Amino acid sequence: MNFATLRSDLLSKPGASEDFPFDVQTLVIKVGGKMFALLGINDDPLRINLKCDPLKAELLREPYPAVQPGYHMNKRHWKTVVLDGSIAEAEIRSMIDESYELVVKGLPKSRRPG
C-alpha cells in the first residue's frame, strides 16, 4: 500500500478531511474535527497512527510486530502500524475502519457525518 492509495482510502470516509496541524511532514486525517489517522509523508517504510481499542491493539501486537504503541500519541488508545508488507491490506483497512468508527462514535451527534 503506497501513500497515494492510503490517502485516497482515508479521505473516502464520510466527512473525512486532511490537515497539517503539526508540521509539513505529518498528514492528519480528521472526521468532525477529530483525528483518526496520522501519516508521516516521508516515512520509509510508511507508517500510520490509528485510534484503537486498547485490548484489541495488544492482541494485534503479538501476531504483527509491525503494530506498535502509538508514536507520539497516547499509547493505550493509539497504535502505529508500519506498512512494511507484513500485514495484509485487508487487515490494514479493517484497522482504518475501526479507527474511523471509534472517532465517529465519540463525536456529538451534531458533528457526525451524514
Predicted feature locations:
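Charge-dense, helix-prone N-terminal extensions
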Residues: 1-114
